[in-house]
């Protein structure tokens, strides 16, 4: 027996046809089925943040605050103080830059158990500068008490949801839409907050990537292998706290370290790694791949990735240059 819910077809077995199995929306709904403390807040973007399933099936635990992101953060903090695990959703730019004072004063400072979930990070939107979050990691990473998480793809989203639920305190979860990331062939991955994941070991250059850039880094590894170079690729799914033990090991065992992020090179993953390398006098060649000190333009993601030097070919070129430097 099948039933239509919110325009999607729901099978009797409980799987949604139209919303991928590994989507955030599916993971949040299933987590809410298991934990009555979970509530879902939306700033008029239930479809665009994959939370329509909560709206349709658990309306008593879904709250639409309209296009009032600052108010949503305040409500989320208040509900968390009453014992809820509050998930607040919008696009990345709107739950970070637009509401930064509310996030700082009502979530980070009092350490309320609010999970701020942002979608369409960096260059993953065609809506141009107003919607391109290239500074959100920098903003959230600088807040005391804030944990920052970005899974590498659909295969890690379910684990990311479980990890942020288990983590007591504020979290910023940075996600791409399920429609922007093809259902991955790789098996489901775990996610331990604060511990990076080595995807594949190499010897010459360590490529530390986050989010969608992990896939680009793996492609770059294959490209530089054609030139006799071996790369370690690491999934840095937790941008704060950074896995400094892993970083130190990689810096001491490789000729070079390279970071790759769908974000500005100012204040993001690259800056965090550079800070640690410099402060601890680790003598390793280092470079960053990301959006340089510029606003991007509108366009599809492959075009923007190539234009701003975030694609696998550019990562490979920078890796080769690092390893060949005197």
Predicted regions mapped to residue ranges:
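Thiamine diphosphate
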Residues: 1-174, 179, 190, ...
């Amino acid at each position: 027996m099948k039933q239509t819910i919110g325009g999607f077809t729901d099978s009797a077995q409980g799987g949604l046809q139209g919303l991928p199995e590994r989507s955030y929306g599916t993971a949040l709904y299933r987590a809410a089925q298991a934990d009555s403390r979970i509530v879902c807040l939306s700033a008029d973007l239930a479809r665009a943040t994959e939370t329509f399933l909560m709206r349709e099936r658990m309306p008593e635990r879904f709250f639409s605050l309209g296009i009032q992101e600052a108010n949503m953060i305040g409500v989320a903090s208040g509900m968390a103080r009453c014992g809820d695990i509050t998930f607040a959703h919008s696009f990345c730019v709107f739950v970070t830059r637009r509401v930064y004072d509310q996030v700082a004063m009502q979530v980070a400072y009092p350490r309320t158990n609010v999970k701020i979930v942002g979608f369409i990070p960096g260059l993953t939107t065609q809506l141009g500068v107003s919607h391109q979050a290239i500074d959100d990691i920098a903003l959230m990473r600088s807040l005391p008490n804030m944990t920052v998480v970005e899974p590498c793809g659909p295969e890690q989203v379910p684990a990311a949801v479980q990890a942020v639920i288990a983590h007591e305190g504020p979290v910023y979860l940075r996600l791409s839409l399920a429609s922007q990331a093809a259902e991955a062939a790789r098996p489901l991955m775990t996610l331990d907050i604060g511990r990076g994941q080595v995807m594949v070991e190499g010897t010459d250059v360590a490529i530390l990537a986050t989010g969608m850039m992990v896939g680009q880094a793996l492609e770059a590894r294959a490209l530089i292998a054609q030139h006799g170079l071996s790369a370690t690729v690491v999934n840095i799914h937790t941008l704060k706290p950074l896995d400094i033990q892993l970083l130190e090991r990689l810096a001491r065992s490789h000729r070079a370290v390279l970071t790759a992020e769908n974000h500005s090179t100012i204040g993001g993953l690259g800056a965090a790694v550079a800070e640690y390398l410099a402060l601890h006098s680790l003598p390793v060649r280092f470079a960053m791949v990301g959006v340089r000190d510029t606003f991007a333009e509108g366009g599809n993601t492959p075009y923007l990735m190539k234009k701003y030097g975030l694609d696998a070919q550019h990562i490979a070129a920078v890796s080769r240059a690092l390893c060949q430097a005197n």
